[in-house]
Amino acid sequence: MKNANKTGIIAVTGATGYVGGRLVPQLLEAGYNVRCIVRNSEALDDRSWRSKVEVYKADLSLKDQVIEALNGVEKAYYLVHSMAASSNFEDLESSMAEIFSKAADINKIKQIVYLGGLGEDEKNHSPHLTSRHKVGKILSNGSTPVTELRAAIIIGSGSASFEMLRSLVEVLPIMVVPKWVTQTRCQPVAISDILFYLVSVLDNDKTLGKIIDVGGPDILTYREMMHTYAQVAGLKKRIIIPVPVLTPRLSSHWVNLTSPLPIRLARSLIDSLTSDVVVSNNPISAVLNHDAENLHNSIGRALTRVQNLQIPTRWSNSVKSQIAELPELSDPEWSGGRVLIDSREQKSLVTGKKVMSTIKTIGGDTGWFAFDWLWAVRGFIDKLAGGVGLRRGRRHPSELRVGDPVDFFTVVK
């Protein structure tokens, strides 16, 4: 039931992504009226909450579209960043943030909530973390009050950080790692806590115009995180050998080969771990009274949800939704991108529904019905090129929706 005091519209950008796709149902449960601003509206068609929200199709890089999308909005979430985008991601992120800030001012929005990356401004960080800090500053340059939450590693079923941790520990009983794995500290936080904070700061005047650090109760090295995962998963303690010669670039290739993550995303995650990312200046505990989940419990919860096929969103949804230059099926031919379509027809003695239910299981553990070894070669070639290969698998063994991964393919319609 709607809360009578929550009549304003709350806009959510990045609703097809990992965090945004989980935030929307939380906002609905809290009684808010939600407008999802997305580039591809079909990506939300199969969400259980689709009929409860307003969907507005807009490209965040186009000012006129963003101004229209924010018309009538009271407050807005900015959950867009380009962890796996192209080399010009910094310019793209800055441009979109500036457009969004100006559009918010024009529409007299009361608050922007932005999820950024944890880390002190004056330190030398990775290009992606530096860009996320810059986006926060650009959003704050306008007249609309901004609440910026900064988080480091997010642990949850389907998150990129969790999948990297999971793959490394489960695949490799012995690891040769760069020395920062045993030295730099991070403060992981559960996705459930992130969602709680995102909802809680919305109507909290104490958070307006503030940069707030968010983290769980544990401060650990990445080696300690891997040992914790092994313990929770019931695996033997991994042998981790630090060496001084593995650069982030070499490490990202190694992660790409052993995990479902594409090399650009792996590099972004690794770069973010090469310096300390812990809560320091303005902790969320000073604003909200909430007992965050420790790493042991958050890993256990994530593993349980994976085993029970409870993965409402996955990192692969975020990668696709955040790369604006990737083509969509609905894009006109003059736009430059193109989705190739190979259409085949074959008569069948069974119903279309039965055929489709079988087709929907393709890929992942099921395989490709014919010439599996050729698909394996295709996946290996994709890995060599820095892609996801076959390890990305599927979100669910028998369900498909727009945006879902099927090994190295993505469902577009």
Residue ranges of each PLM-predicted region?
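Mid/C-terminal beta-alpha module of Rossmann-like enzyme folds, strongest
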Residues: 2-4, 9, 200-265, 276-344
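SDR active-site strand-loop-helix element
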Residues: 13, 37, 79, 112-117, ...
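NAD(P)H-binding glycine-rich loop region in Rossmannoid oxidoreductase-like domains
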Residues: 42, 46-107, 117-124
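Glycine-rich portal/gate segments that line the openings of hydrophobic small-molecule binding cavities
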Residues: 339-340, 347-413
